[in-house]
From Swiss-Prot:
It comes from Bacillus pumilus (strain SAFR-032). Pfam families: GatC. It comes from the Bacteria. It catalyses: L-glutamyl-tRNA(Gln) + L-glutamine + ATP + H2O = L-glutaminyl-tRNA(Gln) + L-glutamate + ADP + phosphate + H(+); L-aspartyl-tRNA(Asn) + L-glutamine + ATP + H2O = L-asparaginyl-tRNA(Asn) + L-glutamate + ADP + phosphate + 2 H(+). This is Aspartyl/glutamyl-tRNA(Asn/Gln) amidotransferase subunit C.
């Protein structure tokens, strides 16, 4: 018995705005059915004495210290702007 129908594959393709042929829909149905079948096999694995993990490596994120740096002066920013007025950068309007 198939775990996913061809109609479901077509529906997902439609939601993803993908145009697929009938042959592609059949092929994807078979492939997805195989993937789902494999994933279902994972439910059969005995994980009784396995400690839950959130990361497979025993490595923490190594980050630099979050130290604020002095930013650019208003003059330095304004000199790079194509259009400015009274210390503000002017941009084209996007709303009517």
């Amino acid at each position: 018995m198939s775990r996913i129908s061809i109609e479901e594959v077509k529906h997902v393709a439609h939601l993803a705005r993908l145009a697929i042929t009938e042959e592609e829909a059949e092929m994807f149905t078979e492939q997805l059915d195989s993937i789902i079948s494999f994933a279902e096999q994972l439910n059969e694995v005995d994980t009784e004495n396995v400690e839950p993990t959130t990361h497979v490596l025993k490595m923490k994120n190594v980050m630099r210290e979050d130290v604020p740096n002095k930013g650019l002066s208003i003059e330095a920013v304004i000199k790079n702007a194509p259009d400015h007025k009274d210390g503000y950068i002017r941009v084209p309007s996007i709303l009517d």
